[in-house]
Amino acid sequence: MAKTYKAKLMTDTKVRTGKVRLSYPHLFEKYDKSDKYQCQLIIDKDDRDTLSCIKKAIENAKADGKSSKWGGKIPGGLRNPLNDGDAMDEGGEVYENAYYINAKSNRKPQVVDLDRDDIFDPEEVYAGCYVRATIVFFPYDNSGAGVGVLLNNVQKLEEGERLGGGAASADEDFQDDEDDDLMG
């Protein structure tokens, strides 16, 4: 039986997700365009535990923003970090029946395996693998108002089909070389 990874609301605004799919990972080096470490987490709509924790943390961040940033009220047009994958025009099937969030950090996240040993090889943690992450939701009021997502740490749980048509390995490309006797 496959192990399940239960989501947890660790503080009012900090969530440890259940099993989610990793996309657009920039975990070992900062992404050039934003100068931040970042990734996208794709959450199955059937993962009620993770979604419940995330929604609660978002509400708590809104309450914090109402009192600390937004002058006692929640502004109209508030940006919500939880996005519906089914509403995307060009998301592909990976976003069907899923939500996604984008998480960023100025600090490099710790990336670990199932035994909580550090992972140093960026090839080991790729778009399409399954992870759980700790993320923190916070209110902001610069360039508009909304709730942002801070990326804390990532734990790789299992392999998954690479997203974006990742390159084949040299082993795969050259495995049948012995069978190709062109001079033959």
Where are these regions (language model features)?
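Structured, beta-strand-rich domain cores
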Residues: 64-143
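Residues in flexible loops and secondary-structure boundaries
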Residues: 18, 30, 49-51, 109-111, ...
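Compact mixed alphabeta submodule
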Residues: 117-184
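Residue-identity detector for glutamine
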Residues: 38-40, 110, 155, 175
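Residues in well-ordered beta-strands of folded domains
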Residues: 40-42, 102-104, 155-157
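OB-fold ssDNA-binding interfaces and closely related basic DNA-contact patches used
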Residues: 1-100
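Intrinsic disorder/low-complexity signal
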Residues: 11, 83-88, 112, 170-180
